[in-house]
Structure formats: structure tokens, C-alpha cells
């Protein structure tokens, strides 16, 4: 029987993004909607834990860089720590709203099982279960807020490039 794996892919969380005009609705709706964005991340973590997924991918725009606060970072990193404690690795990349150059790296360090994919080049990670390579995770984050429309962000994110970067074990991974 061939191996299977489960994972959650989330993107565009925009933690810290403001909702505009909420006070015009009501104080209650303003509070609910303001809590909705970070609560979405909490639900991703809860789903990963309850379903015992193999890994979680969070691909781009984790934060709204101009608005993310210490509290926003704390909430996100607390979720990463819960995943880490459960043995669920996470793979992250930055987006145009939270380029790596604007991350508040002095707030927190990534847990041991969290991998931040590079922003200056295609990058890869190998997911293994019990020493068996099962999946190649590849991507490229945003190094800054502007990406040239002439440059293909996915250029170089290929299986061949992953196998070169990760070595011969990557060739055995059935999923890429």
C-alpha cells in the first residue's frame, strides 16, 4: 500500500489587518470582525491538532506587515509552538504584505519544527515520517513588498531543483 499524508494549507491570513468602518455597524460587530482574522489562525491550529495532520503549510501574507503588533506575533507563534509540541511541522513563506524584510524577528524565534522558506531564491524542505521521505515542500517568499512583473516567482521551483537542493533522499519522496 502506498503511503498517504494529510496536511493543511493556509494562506493570506493577514493577521493584524484592520477592518475599516466597523464602528459604523455596532460595537459588537466591530469586536466580532476584529477577532475573526486571528481566530482563523486558531482554527487552523485546532484543525491540525484534532485531525493529527502530518504538517501545516502557511503560504504568504501571514501578517499585514504595516499593522501586525507584538500581540499578533505572539498569537501566531503560540500556534506554531502548539503544532511543534504535537510533533506537527510547519512550513512558512512570506508574501507581499509581510515580506521577510519587514518581519519582526526580534519578537520570537521559530520553533524547531517550523521551517521558513527563503525569500531570495527557490527553497525546499523534505517532509519525512519515520525516516521515510514522503513530500517535498517547495516555494519562495517575498523578500520585499515589490515583485517585478517580469520575474516569475515560481521560476526554479521544480522537482529537479528540489532534488538537487535536498540530495538523493528527496528523489524517493512520492509527493512534491
Label each residue range with its predicted role.
Residues 55, 66-176:
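His/Asp/Glu-rich metal-coordinating catalytic cores
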Amino acid at each position: 500500500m502506498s503511503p498517504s499524508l494529510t496536511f493543511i494549507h493556509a494562506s493570506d491570513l493577514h493577521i493584524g489587518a484592520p477592518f475599516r468602518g466597523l464602528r459604523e455597524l455596532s460595537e459588537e460587530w466591530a469586536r466580532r470582525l476584529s477577532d475573526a482574522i486571528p481566530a482563523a489562525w486558531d482554527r487552523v491550529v485546532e484543525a491540525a491538532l484534532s485531525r493529527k495532520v502530518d504538517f501545516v503549510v502557511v503560504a504568504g501574507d501571514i501578517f499585514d506587515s504595516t499593522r501586525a503588533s507584538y500581540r499578533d506575533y505572539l498569537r501566531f507563534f503560540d500556534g506554531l509552538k502548539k503544532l511543534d509540541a504535537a510533533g506537527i511541522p510547519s512550513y512558512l513563506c512570506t508574501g507581499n504584505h509581510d515580506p521577510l524584510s519587514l518581519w519582526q524577528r526580534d519578537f520570537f524565534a521559530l520553533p524547531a519544527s517550523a521551517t521558513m522558506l527563503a525569500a531570495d531564491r527557490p527553497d525546499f524542505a523534505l517532509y519525512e515520517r519515520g525516516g521515510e521521505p514522503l513530500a517535498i515542500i517547495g516555494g519562495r517568499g517575498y523578500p520585499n513588498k515589490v515583485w517585478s512583473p517580469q520575474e516569475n516567482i515560481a521560476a526554479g521551483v521544480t522537482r529537479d531543483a528540489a532534488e538537487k537542493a535536498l540530495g538523493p533522499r528527496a528523489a524517493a519522496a512520492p509527493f512534491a
